């Protein structure tokens, strides 16, 4: 029997984009001000243009353990969009995945990374994503809105998939 496929977004799901950017701005306001859109003291997603930003991200709490648990019963793939204004984003994201999940052929995401701004074109059973953009809102399988009311964290996601088995 084939395992069901889960696509996992990176920014805001595996990697803590907003939290890391907020911390970097608080610690170094002069360094990031030029590349930052600030509204009421909070850094927003335009920060994806900061060179090297994706390599600085910390994992979302619980993400690493959850991925390892899910990989036992599901085929996992990263499905992430790339910012048009950051030419190094793809390389930084691949290096981030290697750092946290390993580089060898036994790594859970070895040759399982897809970059696309059309997530609705992916064929699979589940998509874990924090935003309804880049085609996520039209994904043909079940979408788990990470950080939302039903799936606020990785514990809630794991609970859902434990019921699905």
Regions found by a protein language model. Name each.
Residues 15-17, 23, 78, 85-89, ...:
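Short catalytic/ligand-binding loop motif for oxyanion handling, primarily in non-cytosolic enzymes
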Residues 58, 63-91, 97:
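Substrate-recognition element of Asp-dependent hydrolases with the DxDx(T/V) motif
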Residues 5, 108-135:
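Conserved Lys-Pro-Asp/Glu-containing loop-to-beta segment of HAD-superfamily phosphomonoesterases
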Residues 126-159:
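Acidic, Mg2+-coordinating phosphoryl-transfer loop and its flanking beta/alpha structural elements
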